[in-house]
Regions:
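Transmembrane helix-loop junctions in multipass membrane proteins, especially transporters and channels
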Residues: 28, 77, 138-142, 167-176
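Periplasmic/ER-lumenal interhelical loops and adjacent helix-loop junctions
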Residues: 162-209
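Membrane-interface helix-loop-helix junctions at transmembrane boundaries of multi-pass membrane enzymes
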Residues: 140-150
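Short aromatic-rich membrane-water interface segments that cap or initiate transmembrane helices
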Residues: 2-7, 119, 201-209
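Membrane-interface coil-to-helix junctions
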Residues: 1-43, 72-87, 191-197
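Coil-to-alpha-helix initiation sites in intrinsically disordered, low-complexity, charged segments
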Residues: 12-16, 58, 178, 182-185
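Membrane-embedded helix bundles of polyisoprenyl
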Residues: 38, 42-55, 60-137, 155-159, ...
Length: 209
């Protein structure tokens, strides 16, 4: 084996756990990434449309704006190279919950569960939007500071428990991997993405280095 937790292989643990019971009947070369790409594309459009419906009830306007989410270049740059990180519908769903007037905390916990079972990076982003939502609730006087603390720390410890169960804290010792120093982020990367193979922006071109 690889002697490393599944969550560190970018293999979408949610799908792995779903198909694990059927290992004996599935082909040896079976993979679920194509299924996930199709599902992510569908969910990307669904949550984009639901988010747009908050701002407009016009079906045509919502449909057209949904296309911008569905055909966003950054979505296709990631979904085929890294299907787990390409699950950007999680972020759109989080924004929908933030903006929706009928959001309840059960939906946030469900979304966080799926995010953790898909990709840790996306979970961190979803958690950040959740914190912003809870602070907004406090500012609108829908909750008090005590409930805010319970909602944030309760979700934090629930997430830690789930991360421990799934294997986020399991680090193997048998794998040697390179890339350190190459896959790094300079402090000016917010202004200079330093694209390796293409120009990311004509407005803000790469800085000389």
């Amino acid at each position: 084996g690889l002697n490393i937790s599944l969550v560190h292989t970018d293999s979408i643990p949610l799908m792995s756990f779903l198909f694990k019971p059927f290992t004996s009947v599935l082909p040896q070369n079976f993979q679920y990434f194509g299924i996930w790409i199709l599902l992510s594309t569908f969910l990307q459009s669904i949550f984009a449309y639901k988010t747009m419906k908050i701002f407009s009830k016009d079906v045509f306007i919502c449909s057209v704006t949904t296309l911008f989410f569905l055909f966003a270049p950054i979505f296709y740059m990631r979904i085929f190279a890294q299907p787990a990180i390409g699950s950007q519908w999680l972020l759109i769903a989080a924004l929908y919950l933030y903006l929706s007037p009928n959001t309840n905390y059960k939906r946030w916990f469900i979304l966080s569960f799926f995010a953790l079972m898909i990709n840790g990076y996306l979970f961190a982003m979803v958690f950040g939007i959740y914190i912003a939502f809870v602070i907004k609730e406090l500012m609108e006087k829908n909750i008090n500071f005590t409930k805010l603390s319970l909602l944030i720390f309760g979700k934090f410890f629930f997430s830690l428990l789930l991360m421990w169960i799934v294997g986020y804290f399991s680090v193997g010792t048998g794998i040697q991997e390179g890339g350190f120093g190459f896959y790094k982020m300079n402090l000016n990367s917010f202004f200079d993405p330093m694209a390796l193979y293409e120009l990311h922006s004509r407005i803000m071109p790469d800085l000389p280095s």
